[in-house]
Each structure stands twice: as structure tokens, then as C-alpha cells.
Amino acid sequence: NFTNTMSEINDKIEISGTKTWIDGGKTHNNATEITLVLTRTSTKPGSVEETVVATPTWDGNTYTFNDLAKYDTEGYLYEYKVVENAIDGYTTVQDGRNFINTISDINEKINVIGTKTWIDGGREHDNTTEITLVLTRTSTKPGSVEETVEVTPTWNGSTYTFSNLTKYDAEGYLYTYKVAENPIDGYTTKVNG
């Protein structure tokens, strides 16, 4: 009896991918914060997916599973798949073997609220026409530049509200908002807060 075994049956491969965080530049230790699960299925008809017990190595934001069998014991190719366990506070998008984790509330909206006080002997004022408020924001990302936000506040008596403002920039850095008032003839302006 003869058995012919292909010479490549013991070949090994590696599986790699990347990890991207969109959360305002927070520092992460991928090796301890992320759980990647590696599975494989033989291309032999009727094969069932099985979990591979393996720990990836990390080089920055690139992971690699090393020394993986390329073929099963009968010479059928293995197909490998990597999934990431959910991380609290993040939404994960998988693109092939690459993962992008974005803070879950990146699309959260906020309001900026303040009040206008007139010290002028009780004169009547229409804040919606007499006052021009300018809203600016700066990302907390180092090197960011202040930008004007084109939005008009709503007024309820002496209280103004800038509504539905973006809390984070596209990279997950918090925005800091600031309100200024254009000068009004005959008045000096003092900002509190």
C-alpha cells in the first residue's frame, strides 16, 4: 500500500489585520483591551467551523496570528476568519480583517445655553433683533483652529439656546464651544461663563 502526501501539508501561514480607533486620540493597549477570536473551516465539503486557540501579536495597531496550519490533515485548505468581541462604549465596523472602533456617542448632539442680562433701567429689548451672538468651536485635537459655527440661537425670554450641535469632530475629539456677542452701541458687554 502506498500513501502519497502533498509536500506542502505542513505549511504554515499568518493572518494579519489592523485596528483603528476613532475616539479622540485616546491611548489604547490593543493586546489587553481587544479580544480577537480566530476561527477556521476546512474547504472539505461538510466541514464545520472551529475556534482556533491562538493569541495574536501586536505591532502598534497591526495584529498577526502566526504559525497557522495552511491545510487540514487531508490536504484541504483552511479558510480563516477573525472577529472582535464587542467593546463597551464603542461601535465596531469590520472590513475584511481590519477593525474600526468608534466611540458609540460620536454622533451625539448637545445644546449651548446662556442668558442675556440688560442693566439699563428696565428698558424693553428684543433680543432676537438687538443682539448678534457668534458661536465658535475648537476641537480638543492638538493643533486645531477655532472655527465659526453658522447657526442662529432660539430665544425664550432672556435665555438663548444653540441647539443640535455636534459634540465630537470626525476623529472623536470633543468640541469646545464659545459664545461671543457683537458690540452694541451705547453698552459695554461683560461675559460670565
Locate each region found by the language model:
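Solvent-exposed loop/turn and edge beta-strand elements of beta-rich ligand-binding domains
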Residues: N1-G193
